[in-house]
């Protein structure tokens, strides 16, 4: 990992705004109506390449993929792991009234599914992790940032958004999530 003794290195974490065309494809995938998975892959690859270049151009030292290929920073795991087929809950954000632009974007979106955990958690699509890595590596090769990293959902944030209806205790749920997600953390 890059270090500096002369200045604070810059980075960020979290989701960056997705291009509208990519957002529409992600929403179609989420709704189960995506017909062209190749178009989604190409759109993610293009968007990640552009956002990495923009970060380099903005002098960000340690860039990320902005989570552009994920429907949500924590809920994407439902597509990669088993055990998330239960009825979910939707949280209502009271602060939306103060941010009408954010509310308007949310209204256009069909929403992100937040199923609950209702079965044993295991990997069902480990290859998706490698796809994310390959897309990011291609973007990094083109833009040549000083350093790059990728995020992964923590067990705590997954447990917060995807409620447990299967494991006997929250501790057991978190421990299982940590054990399974460890493979993504180490990839």
PLM ranges: what are they?
Residues 1-187:
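Domain-level signal for soluble alpha/beta catalytic cores
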């Amino acid at each position: 990992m890059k270090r500096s003794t002369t200045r604070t290195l810059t980075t960020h974490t979290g989701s960056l705004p997705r291009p509208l065309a990519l957002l529409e494809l992600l929403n179609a995938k989420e709704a189960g109506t995506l017909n062209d998975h190749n178009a989604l892959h190409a759109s993610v690859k293009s968007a990640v390449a552009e956002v990495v270049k923009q970060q380099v151009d903005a002098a960000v030292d340690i860039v990320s993929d902005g989570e552009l290929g994920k429907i949500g920073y924590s809920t994407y795991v439902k597509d990669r792991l088993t055990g998330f087929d239960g009825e979910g809950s939707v949280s209502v954000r009271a602060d939306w009234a103060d941010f009408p632009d954010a509310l308007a974007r949310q209204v256009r979106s069909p929403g992100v599914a937040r199923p609950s955990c209702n079965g044993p958690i295991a990997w069902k699509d480990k290859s998706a992790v490698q796809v994310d890595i390959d897309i990011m590596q291609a973007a990094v090769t083109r833009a040549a940032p000083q350093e790059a990293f990728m995020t992964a959902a923590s067990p705590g944030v997954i447990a917060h958004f995807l409620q447990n209806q299967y494991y006997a205790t929250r501790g057991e749920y978190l421990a299982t999530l940590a054990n399974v997600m460890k493979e993504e953390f180490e990839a």
